[in-house]
Amino acid sequence: MKKKLSHVTPAGQPTMVNVSEKKATLRTARARATMNVGNEILSMLSDNEIVLKKGPVFQTAIIAGVMGAKRTSGLIPLCHPIGLDDCKVEINVKSGKIVIETSATTVGKTGVEMEALTAASVAALTVYDMCKAISHGIVIENIMLLEKRGGKSDFTA
């Protein structure tokens, strides 16, 4: 059987998925964004030298990521508004890159993949915004879902 897009009607029109008949269950998701910021910024971040006019980079990006997750349904048109029970954003430097890992949790009728992905994306965009005065050569790479649990199926990358 051919798979179908869940947010498109048979007539090709966008539609929100009706979740009214679903039971509320525990839903979790984890996502990651990787950034290549170059050696100059990386060494400044590693040495805690960067506290810019806009504030401390990683701490600001963590807050921005959580805020982004909470506002996902306002950014992605057909995404259901959900009550997040938890959202975490961790930022580390690994193998010469910035690695942003996020998690989102709810008990609800729909998953939290988009919230975890939005948290990772917004945190990465915030790092870019705060460091662009040093270099515009920053690259946000590999924004990806690592895992989702709950609902019809589970997924692990």
Predicted regions and their residues:
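C-terminal binding/interaction regions
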Residues: 1-80, 84-157
